[in-house]
Amino acid sequence: HLLKKPYDFVGAFKTLPNSLQLLMVHSAQSLAFNHSLSCRMESGMSIIEPVEGDLVAPILSNGRIDVGKMARVSSTNLVRCQRNCELGRLAVTGILPGSDSNHASCEPGDFEVQGIDAAGLSDVDWVVKEIPRLTTSGTRRALSVPFRDLTIEQAPETNDLFNRWEEGPLEGDRWHPEGASLRLRFTLPAGAYATVLMREFMRSPLDHY
């Protein structure tokens, strides 16, 4: 498209499937979320226990959060919110920015502003006039998600992955052939990635799981 119309960037973008166009917006939002989360973690502030200024949301039975029933943590409800987070009823949330974003306040809000700035999105209004369906008002996402039903067992030799085990470690690999080949099973809420949890278990490079 750009070969025929070198400056028609919007037209070129529209040649992508609608799902990929929307994914670009979601990716930008997630980048800001990740930077904000990193700022918070680097400060030593908990991502599980709320502090004043946080926005907390109820956790639904499917593990998702109800963003329509969020509450702002203040000095008057801090202890109650902390207790409900500890019991798994509420989750501390982070921002997925948009045209009408609901920001946290106090120090958690500062981390969100820093994250959006680090992502290079401070001047973005999230209103896509050329492709209105990509305009987003923004929402929030839980800073942490629970996992359930964890089981660990040694993988049998008949497992499909055993051939890879027999080949042994390749150059740059960080596992030992005399170790154990394990199978982990667990349940995550919809939208959570098993590979992310496995990275936390394994503490390995991205190409090792």
Positions of the model-derived regions?
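Non-catalytic, substrate/partner-engaging modules appended to enzymatic cores
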Residues: 1-209
